[in-house]
């Protein structure tokens, strides 16, 4: 699943080809995604794009009339291609702009979404989202206060978008390992020092992943078709039974919240 670094990579890749250009039309081949493609998007024509931003794992295309909200789902990707490019089986949406290019959305599992809103402040999917992990709002004191009375496994807590957005499975695993904290530790038992370490590590891991163009494990490609290279730097994620890069012991895995979790039992003691 594309996580925050992958979505940020996509945003940076597509922005130069879309910002300040005009949407000529939107071609929708498969309107039934996770949610049906918004009718306003299907009929959108001759509208200027004024900006592109990101909120959590959502791409936001700002136009003169409203906002296109895109989510890549489990296997989606976006890329910029010439308007005469051949269409692949899973190319479901084209946003055609007046520079000879188009934004093409590909999604084999069709679990993404492309929606429309005229008011971001009232957009229902954004109302309960926590702070951005790279923002000043996400800090040690915030995490400490948010974790009090939370008898939840720490990894599950960090992946809760109401706590902080965009810390997905890969980056939660990596951050906890670097900090030496067991993924099953109860959130309420975090110390202030651990919160300080976790916040700084999460920010550092995400920034490094963005620089590397995200993590390619299966479906994700950058907008230019290249893979993300952060997978080459993963310390524990996907490395079950391999030696721990810190102590040489064996990396173990377990299921937490229906997601695979990877950790070193020697370096990440539960408590």
Swiss-Prot record:
Coiled-coil region(s): none
EC number: 3.2.2.23, 4.2.99.18
Bound cofactor: record note: Binds 1 zinc ion per subunit.
Catalytic activities: Hydrolysis of DNA containing ring-opened 7-methylguanine residues, releasing 2,6-diamino-4-hydroxy-5-(N-methyl)formamidopyrimidine; 2'-deoxyribonucleotide-(2'-deoxyribose 5'-phosphate)-2'-deoxyribonucleotide-DNA = a 3'-end 2'-deoxyribonucleotide-(2,3-dehydro-2,3-deoxyribose 5'-phosphate)-DNA + a 5'-end 5'-phospho-2'-deoxyribonucleoside-DNA + H(+)
UniProt-listed PROSITE patterns: FPG_CAT, ZF_FPG_1, ZF_FPG_2
Recorded name of the encoding gene: mutM
Protein name: Formamidopyrimidine-DNA glycosylase
Family recorded in the similarity comment: Belongs to the FPG family.
Keywords: DNA damage, DNA repair, DNA-binding, Glycosidase, Hydrolase, Lyase, Metal-binding, Multifunctional enzyme, Zinc, Zinc-finger
GO-annotated molecular function: 8-oxo-7,8-dihydroguanine DNA N-glycosylase activity; class I DNA-(apurinic or apyrimidinic site) endonuclease activity; damaged DNA binding; zinc ion binding
Cofactors required: Zn(2+)
Zinc finger (FPG-type): 235-269
């Amino acid at each position: 699943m594309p996580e925050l670094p992958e979505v940020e990579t996509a945003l940076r890749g597509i922005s130069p080809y879309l910002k300040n250009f005009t949407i000529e039309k939107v071609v929708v081949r498969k309107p039934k995604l996770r949610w049906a493609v918004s009718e306003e998007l299907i009929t959108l024509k001759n509208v200027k794009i004024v900006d592109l931003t990101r909120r959590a794992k959502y791409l936001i295309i700002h136009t003169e009339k409203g906002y296109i909200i895109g989510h890549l789902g489990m296997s989606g990707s976006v890329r910029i291609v010439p308007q005469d490019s051949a269409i692949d089986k899973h190319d479901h949406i084209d946003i055609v702009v007046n520079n000879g290019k188009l934004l093409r959305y590909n999604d084999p599992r069709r679990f993404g979404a492309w929606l429309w809103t005229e008011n971001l402040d009232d957009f229902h999917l954004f109302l309960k989202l926590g702070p951005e992990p790279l923002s000043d709002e996400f800090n040690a004191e915030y995490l400490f206060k948010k974790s009090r009375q939370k008898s939840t496994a720490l990894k599950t807590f960090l992946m809760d978008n109401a706590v902080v957005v965009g810390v997905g499975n890969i980056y939660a695993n990596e951050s906890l390992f670097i900090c030496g904290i067991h993924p099953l530790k109860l959130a309420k038992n975090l110390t202030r020092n651990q919160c300080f370490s976790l916040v700084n590590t999460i920010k550092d891991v995400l920034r490094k992943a963005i620089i590397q163009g995200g993590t390619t494990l299966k479906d994700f490609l950058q907008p230019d078709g290249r893979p993300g290279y952060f997978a080459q730097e993963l310390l524990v994620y996907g490395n079950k039974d391999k030696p721990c890069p810190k102590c040489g012991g064996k990396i173990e895995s377990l299921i937490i919240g229906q997601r695979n979790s990877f950790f070193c039992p020697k370096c990440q003691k539960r408590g």
